[in-house]
């Protein structure tokens, strides 16, 4: 494998038409030093590009495809839904059906509002938190990505915790100053924020498992401490489970860790591969959202019938037994990748949460973004390119994890481990 002639030509055609030739930056493959590969079709755990190369896929559209590509049930029900109409701008039954499933399985959610993306979900949840508490500031964690809303595109300055600085041109400093940022898993920095800014702290927003720094689980007691201190301070705790929701566990990460937030943001899996997001939580908080309350949120395509249908038939197929099988396969893949790297003297650290795995090229244990950044990016790029040539599709970024689906077979896992052994051997002998 390695013939990507048609992909190269397709990218040349796209570059003058879209910023960087893509509609989301990471897809440009800049960090791995090659042209993006254009995909054409997928089925189960496999995906095929426009040059005819087939891959075992661990990107899965960045996580949503927990049943694999083109699941038969989801596709059939989407065909039926499409024939009835693609959008109504009116209530319909599948909104209610999906809402019932979400409320049944997510411990924190009594009431849920459907939106169109994870970014919409986090932006709306923060507006709700500010409106409900009457406070302005929020606390987020370095390396935790919550979408591209202005108040969330913030990085930390110097010191334990500082007033935020914009992480992108176009974000006003006046907006950034209401966002406080500390390191993930750093309880003492969180304590400082509460002691210094507690009276105006509306919310703490956190990924219960950080998935945008390469899969970093919480340290023991971290989430529990956030829960205790937010309750004591009258601050809302928001779990961003856009990535972890229904992927880390049957009842999401909050069910696995036994920590219940005030609000939860969802996306990815609950849309079955279609654009979707949701936020929900305690009834007394959610009833502040219009039309029940004064805090405004709306969307033309929110709860559209296609996304709701795909989401409903995705979640309705998932069982508790599936998550046990996820764990078994993920443990095997984790162990196999680690053994392959060790065999060839490749420095590495590996983390796992449910069916998410993060492989870092560093000898240091990775428990926050600072440690994730010690990973050798050149080594990752070589690994990515080697695996792609071996027929394994991984995310083209060190700071994204890999995902498993119910469609991944034991043979897929073993083939992936064997490919990694060959790639690591080639890297070690250069």
UniProtKB/Swiss-Prot annotation:
Keywords: Cytoplasm, Isomerase, Porphyrin biosynthesis, Pyridoxal phosphate. GO terms for cellular component: cytoplasm. CDD domains: OAT_like. It catalyses: (S)-4-amino-5-oxopentanoate = 5-aminolevulinate. PROSITE patterns: AA_TRANSFER_CLASS_3. It is found in: Cytoplasm. The keyword Cytoplasm applies. GO terms for molecular function: glutamate-1-semialdehyde 2,1-aminomutase activity; pyridoxal phosphate binding; transaminase activity. GO terms for biological process: protoporphyrinogen IX biosynthetic process. Its EC number is 5.4.3.8. InterPro entries: 4pyrrol_synth_GluAld_NH2Trfase, Aminotrans_3, Aminotrans_3_PPA_site, PyrdxlP-dep_Trfase, PyrdxlP-dep_Trfase_major, PyrdxlP-dep_Trfase_small. Belongs to the class-III pyridoxal-phosphate-dependent aminotransferase family. HemL subfamily. This is Glutamate-1-semialdehyde 2,1-aminomutase 2. It comes from Shouchella clausii (strain KSM-K16). The lineage of its organism: Bacteria, Bacillati, Bacillota, Bacilli, Bacillales.
